[in-house]
Amino acid sequence: MSRAFSRDPLFMYVFGDSELDSEARKSVTAFLSFLFDKSFLFHEEVWGIFDEDSLLGTYVVEKPQTSKLPNIKGGFLLISRLIPLVFQLSGKTLILLNSYMRITRSAAPPWKHHYLIMIGVKPEAQGKGVGKTMMQHLFQTTQADPESQGIALDTEKEENVALYQKLGFTLREQTKIDNVPVYCMVYQKNR
């Protein structure tokens, strides 16, 4: 899935050009692997679309929390996965990622919601409805969850803002991580 993020402005800034730089590619792969591991440890939703054995697109969504107990248990298990990541990514990269998380989470709505951590489609599958199908599934999941009042997400691509607005999202906050613009958006169900 790392190729799905090769032109992402945040990934380009934090990791470098993963299409041209093998070290950047290794860092992106390590980070995405960590995100998937974290998602399984915290019982987040990981959903994808396949063509036979080939993953075309996937998303990772944090669900609204009703209990802190699974997070505590997952947190202890996550530490064992975080330690190797510290040796795979530079200190600067870890600081930038931490800043990104802090800034974007502070822009999230105060009500219980699903948080779209990431959504990506392989370049050769883009424009074929894979992303739209994944978003439709996320909307169905959110509508079926009585705990959730909507969805929050962040994008660094200005052209994605209009795309998400067509799906019913509103721009909650616009900020920057150094020179990288970040658009924090929300979808509130039953408006």
Predicted regions span which residues?
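Conserved acyl-donor/pantetheine-binding loop and adjacent beta-alpha core of acyl/acetyltransferases
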Residues: 58-119
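Conserved beta-hairpin
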Residues: 41-61
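A short helix-loop-beta-strand connector motif used in the catalytic cores of GNAT acetyltransferases and
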Residues: 30-48, 115
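Conserved active-site alpha-helix within GNAT-family acetyltransferase domains
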Residues: 132, 144-147, 157-174, 181
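C-terminal "cap" of GNAT-fold acetyltransferases
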Residues: 149-158, 177-191
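Conserved GNAT acetyl-CoA-binding A-motif
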Residues: 111-114, 142-156
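Helix-loop element at the rim of GNAT/NAT acetyltransferase active sites that forms part
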Residues: 1-26
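Conserved acetyl-CoA-binding loop-helix of GNAT-fold acetyltransferases
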Residues: 121, 127-140, 166
